[in-house]
Amino acid sequence: MQLVGSGNQAKRHPLFTADGSVTTGGTPQLILPETPSRSFLMLQNVSAGPLWFEFGSARATAALTNGAISSITVTNAGFNFSKPPVVRFAGGGYSGNTAFLGLNQPGGDGPNSSIVAGRVARAHCVMTGSAPNLSISSIVIDDHGAGYAIAPYVFIMNSDLDPYGCAVPSATSGMLLSAASAPYLLNGTSCFTDAIAVFGATTGQAFLCRWMT
């Protein structure tokens, strides 16, 4: 995608539409699956009641004991999966200095063997339900890892074979757009490509969704 008005915008860049309404009140609903590219996104609530939107895959947190992951708690089981999503651990290492408290975010160093014997943990998802509406029932630790300074960030991402799984939106989870509020816009240097889902309490609540690749 080239910037509008630039000399390199020499082909069509259409705006795609995924407008809709809540099919069944009180039930999460997928709006868009994960996409290879997305340069613009607009979401707007045009109904008379609040709507909640969620982005990306399921979510979980890790607990640490003596430098190793001791347990993983699923905080958002996700929905609409046909394949188990992938679990990755980000950050949590000493970053070459045992005085460092660790950074439990993507981009933070993981444990390694440079100053203490360390290795990154491994885990996999156990699913419940039937495809295409699987959700995560638990996460099994295959390798507890070693040498963590702080519990790492648990990053759950959809399988390459399944772009349709998404975090569950609800009245207590997700981005709230109030009735007839201003649109949520992403336009410029970055726009996520994650799956997007919506939740509304009442059947028929309408929303707008427009995007560009």
Q: What residue spans do the PLM features occupy?
A:
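C-terminal interaction-tip segments
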Residues: 1-28, 199-213
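Beta-rich globular "head" domains
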Residues: 19, 25-56, 210
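Beta-sandwich interaction modules
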Residues: 30-33, 172-193
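Short proline/glycine-enriched turn/loop motifs at strand-loop junctions of beta-rich domains
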Residues: 35-38, 45-50, 79-82, 148-149, ...
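Noncatalytic modules at the cell exterior or secretory-pathway interfaces
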Residues: 39-41, 188-205
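Short, flexible beta-strand-to-coil junctions
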Residues: 43-50, 55-56, 157-161, 198-203, ...
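Conserved, function-critical positions that sit in or immediately flank catalytic
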Residues: 57-173
